[in-house]
Amino acid sequence: MCGIVGVVGNTNATDILIQGLEKLEYRGYDSAGIFVVGDNKSQLVKSVGRIAEIQAKVGDSVSGTTGIGHTRWATHGKPTEGNAHPHTSGSGRFVLVHNGVIENYLQIKETYLTKHNLKGETDTEIAIHLVEHFVEEDNLSVLEAFKKALHIIEGSYAFALIDSQDADTIYVAKNKSPLLIGLGNGYNMVCSDAMAMIRETSEYMEIHDKELVIVKKDSVEVQDYDGNVIERGSYTAELDLSDIGKGTYPFYMLKEIDEQPTVMRKLISTYANESGDMNVDSDIIKSVQEADRLYILAAGTSYHAGFAAKTMIEKLTDTPVELGVSSEWGYNMPLLSKKPMFILLSQSGETADSRQVLVKANEMGIPSLTITNVPGSTLSREATYTMLIHAGPEIAVASTKAYTAQVATLAFLAKAVGEANGKAEAKDFDLVHELSIVAQSIEATLSEKDVISEKVEQLLISTRNAFYIGRGNDYYVTMEAALKLKEISYIQTEGFAAGELKHGTISLIEDNTPVIALISADSTIAAHTRGNIQEVVSRGANALIIVEEGLEREGDDIIVNKVHPFLSAISMVIPTQLIAYYASLQRGLDVDKPRNLAKAVTVE
């Protein structure tokens, strides 16, 4: 949610800011702005809408070597130009961008800022006026005023501050919100995501919570809020420009759907050796073995991936698995087992709700494993252990390859632990072979894009509602399938356990209601699901049947190549991803950037 980019150095800041903000578009936003200063001149440009509108406003009129930019996803205040970032202080001297939520902004306003002319509706405006207040009223330097403000401000935040009277410095601070420093030659940068700086640098420095950084073109100094200097090394990010381009694809989502066979094979080469033996950290295996119950905490698509792997983990390890929604557990953690272990699933590794749970787990001394796509992310740094899903950058807001990669990564973990436990079922489960078959199954489904597109046009082009139904693992897939369809096509969609239809949901079925049924696993489950299909068809529904090879009947719509039952949630989800894609495309919507959504949810 939101994105920050900043640069100080000897280069054209405007171009870098615009390019950086474009790389952060995938995070989600409704307004944007930049501030550039240099040669005793400065300019602030803001707009509601896309980055292109900022670019059009800028033209050739803005130049300078220091600047900050921001994409905003509204939390406090409507998406207006006035509420867009950057924000200025009352005198215009100080300029600030902010991600996060200032929880005590009303208290700050009433205590310190009663004489200040606050124009907007945002909590960010409070922060910049507070800094100016301490400079003017307490006669503090900018650095000391910023520190004093940081001691008072409560909540989650990532700040980048410029004093227009000192165009050679950006002041940065963070707490519970992602922010990085990019190190260049003769310039340095600030960003929410390494993606924003991929053209300029591959060397980065982490900022930890409640740290302040003084960024100049030739130096970076990290301090705590009391002014103590902290030594901090840098690291090199493994990103490539080719990874973040669309190439010949019209949308990132379609590209990322197509990349899933490659991701499966990448995971095989990462978590298994040439002999097919598991290559999972022995410390992780031991920690899982010592747990009497595993708790998978996640949100959105990652939550569904946890469900998709639950049965497999339990059968291969003999360890019970419980799923939890991170946003609920952060406030209301249930009674835990005697030896719990937390597994946190997050594509970005920055999900604020999951981090809230992780902080509590660490306080309680509970071991934790983060499964993420981003090395060095907050959840990765703060968990006891990390496993990477190696999906490559996922730009589209609607997650696809991260879901399948999370399920596959959990499969490697489950097999490794099961083998260590001496479980025969785990030893007999040839994961390398079976996941190779999954990759082939995905490729076969991807070759049927035209067929799926035609089915979507017949079924979903004008509907306002739709339902997915399934049993067993297929039910878990329907949850993810429904989320995909609703978030990018805006069709109100729900995924249900097929057996629950008659307990209430069937009352919503009427003429031409689309019902998409998933059938895999075995003939007994298939027969029951087909019975449910007949129930809705007899009440006027239009049914589309996605069925695994070997269970198909004449008239079924999409046949998915058979895979091992433990991995069917991967192969069965692929046609539903394409259904969502084509439903959005055929409705003329922005597939990659659905309204109101953010890629990384970094506020609670």
Swiss-Prot record:
Catalysis performed (reactions): D-fructose 6-phosphate + L-glutamine = D-glucosamine 6-phosphate + L-glutamate
The reply to whether Cytoplasm figures as a keyword in the UniProt entry is: yes
Q: What is its EC number?
A: 2.6.1.16
Q: Which UniProt keywords apply?
A: Aminotransferase, Cytoplasm, Glutamine amidotransferase, Repeat, Transferase
**What GO MF annotations does this protein's record show?**
carbohydrate derivative binding; glutamine-fructose-6-phosphate transaminase (isomerizing) activity
Give the matching Pfam families. GATase_6, SIS
Q: Which purpose does this protein serve, as stated in its record?
A: Catalyzes the first step in hexosamine metabolism, converting fructose-6P into glucosamine-6P using glutamine as a nitrogen source.
The cellular location(s) given in this protein's UniProt record come to: Cytoplasm
Query: Which PANTHER family does UniProt cross-reference here?
Result: GLUCOSAMINE--FRUCTOSE-6-PHOSPHATE AMINOTRANSFERASE, ISOMERIZING, GLUTAMINE--FRUCTOSE-6-PHOSPHATE TRANSAMINASE (ISOMERIZING)
Q: What class of enzyme is it?
A: transferase
Q: Name one GO biological process term.
A: carbohydrate metabolic process
Please give an example of a GO cellular component term from this record: cytosol
Boundaries of every SIS domain copy: 284-423, 456-594
- CDD domains noted in UniProt: GFAT (cd00714), SIS_GlmS_GlmD_1 (cd05008), SIS_GlmS_GlmD_2 (cd05009)
Quote the subunit structure annotation.
Answer: Homodimer.
Instruction: Say yes or no: keyword Transferase present.
Output: yes
Q: Which InterPro entries match?
A: GATase_2_dom, GFAT, GFAT_N, GlmS/AgaS_SIS, GlmS/FrlB_SIS, Ntn_hydrolases_N, SIS_dom, SIS_dom_sf
- Cysteine pairs bridged by disulfides in the record: none
Q: Active site located where?
A: C2, K599
What is the name attached to this protein's record? Glutamine--fructose-6-phosphate aminotransferase [isomerizing]
Q: What SUPFAM superfamilies does the annotation carry?
A: N-terminal nucleophile aminohydrolases (Ntn hydrolases), SIS domain
